[in-house]
Amino acid sequence: MTTSDVPSSSIPARGGAPRTLGSSVIAFTRQTWAGLRVLLALTVLLGIAYPLAVTGVGQLVFPWQANGSLLTADGSHVTSPAGNAHGPAIGSALIGQSFSGATWFHPRPSAAGTGYDTLASGGSNLGPTNPTLLATVQERRAQVAAEDGVDPSTVPPDAVTASASGLDPDISPAYAREQVARVAAARGLPVARVAALVDQHVRGRTLGVLGEPRVDVLALNLALTTMAP
């Protein structure tokens, strides 16, 4: 009898006894059940336990940061939009918002929606040689120079370009210092006092090497409201 004459169901499996249809189904069922158990275990561990643990640690160790880094009008840190006895939260130290008028330090431009739209975070996606971007930058440079009373060639880049998120809360120390004279004059404050306030709000590079020195616009403007002429 040749191999071709032997029924396929009785051909011995490599290294063992013949495998029947029933044994194949049992093996498949066992493998499937093992895979489902691994899936279930990882779902509970990584989809439920781990997020809850991280959330719990965040609430215990970094409650302010974990709840959005919210600030009230007097600069107090709160963990809820409802705020505290000093009033409701008016913004986040991590989210840029619009300030207009000569009495405030201005943030960098925003391309998020119609401007500072948290539901449409993003940049303009225009390349550095795009005519629309170049025209917009020139227009912004002229406007900022006129507002701050400086030469257009000295306007810092972040004063005329939007961030990748459109929600950058920070500006460069150079842009903050450029606005000092305007803000001081509008509020009737000595230039030296406003300049000192800016210096107090300059934060260095993260871990000493990451990013650039920066100034949080919301925190700076909140501190500005406490200064009397």
Where are these regions (language model features)?
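Extracytoplasmic/periplasmic C-terminal soluble domains
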Residues: 178-229
